[in-house]
Amino acid sequence: MLRNGSIVTEFILVGFQQSSTSTRALLFALFLALYSLTMAMNGLIIFITSWTDPKLNSPMYFFLGHLSLLDVCFITTTIPQMLIHLVVRDHIVSFVCCMTQMYFVFCVGVAECILLAFMAYDRYVAICYPLNYVPIISQKVCVRLVGTAWFFGLINGIFLEYISFREPFRRDNHIESFFCEAPIVIGLSCGDPQFSLWAIFADAIVVILSPMVLTVTSYVHILATILSKASSSGRGKTFSTCASHLTVVIFLYTSAMFSYMNPHSTHGPDKDKPFSLLYTIITPMCNPIIYSFRNKEIKEAMVRALGRTRLAQPQSV
C-alpha cells in the first residue's frame, strides 16, 4: 500500500496474481513454447533474408527481414517478464523498467504498423504496375521506407512516453495487466487521465488507423487487378495469399485499436487482456508463417542454406 502523498517508485503487475498454481504452470509452459517458436521462426527469417542469396536480393525480402526483427523486439519486450512473473511470487516492476517497457512497446508497435502498410504498398506496385516496379520501389526507396518506419516508431515512442508520464503517480500502483500497458498506467496518475487518453487516441488515428486504411486499400486494388487479369488457378492462389495477409494485419490493427483508441476507458482490464495477448504474442508468431514460410523463394533458400551447412560439416571435422 502507498502512503498518502508518497511518490510511486514501482508498480505491481496483478495480471496473473489471481491465477492458481496449476494455471500459472500451464501458462508458463504455453508462453515459453510460443516465445521459443516465435524467436526461432523470426530468427531463421532474419538469417535467410540477410544471407547473401541473389534470389532474395529484392525489396520484399528486405521488408520481411525487418518485419521479423521488429517481431523479435516486440515479443522480447513483454514475454520474458511475463514468464518470470508466472514463476516468482512478487510481481513488482520498477518505475524506470515500466517506462522502458512502454517505450519499446510504443516504438516497435508503431514501426510495425507502418512497415506492414509499406509492405502492402510494395505488393500493390509489384502486381498492379509490374513494369514500373523497379523504378518505383528501388533499393534506395526501400531503405528509406524501412528507415521511415523505424524513425516514426522512435519519435512516436518519445511522444507517447511523455503523454503517459506527464502527471505524477501518488495513488494506487497496481496495474491490472500482465505488462505495463499505457491506458491502464495512465489511469493510475494523479491528474485527469482524459487528456492523455485523448492524445493517444489522436495519435493512434495517425499511426494505426491510417496504415490500416492504406494496407486494406492496397490489397483491395491487388484483388481487383488479379480478378480482371489472372486465370482461375492464379486467382485462387492470390486470393488465398491476400486473405491470409489481411487476416494477420487486421488482427494486429484491431487489437491495438481496441486497446489504445478508447479515450473513455470503457473496457475493463479483463476484457482487454485477450486483445493484449493477441498483438503481443499471436501476431509476432503468425507473421513469419503467413508472410515468409508460405513463400516459395524463402523455402528454397532454407533448403540451400541447410545444404551448405551439411556440406560444411565434414570439412570442419
UniProtKB/Swiss-Prot annotation:
Cystine crosslinks: 98-190
Query: What is its membrane topology?
Result: Multi-pass membrane protein
GO annotations of cellular component type: plasma membrane
Which chain positions lie within coiled-coil regions?
none
Q: Which UniProt keywords apply?
A: Cell membrane, Disulfide bond, G-protein coupled receptor, Glycoprotein, Membrane, Olfaction, Receptor, Sensory transduction, Transducer, Transmembrane, Transmembrane helix
Q: Does the keyword Transmembrane apply?
A: yes
Q: Where in the cell is it found?
A: Cell membrane
One family from Pfam that matches here is 7tm_4
GO biological process assignments: detection of chemical stimulus involved in sensory perception of smell
Cytoplasmic side, ranges: 47-55, 122-140, 219-238, 294-317
> Is Cell inner membrane tagged as a keyword?
no
Q: What does this protein do?
A: Odorant receptor.
Q: Which PANTHER family match?
A: OLFACTORY RECEPTOR
What family is this protein classified in?
Answer: Belongs to the G-protein coupled receptor 1 family.
Name used for this protein in its record: Olfactory receptor 10AD1
Lineage, highest ranks first: Eukaryota, Metazoa, Chordata, Craniata, Vertebrata
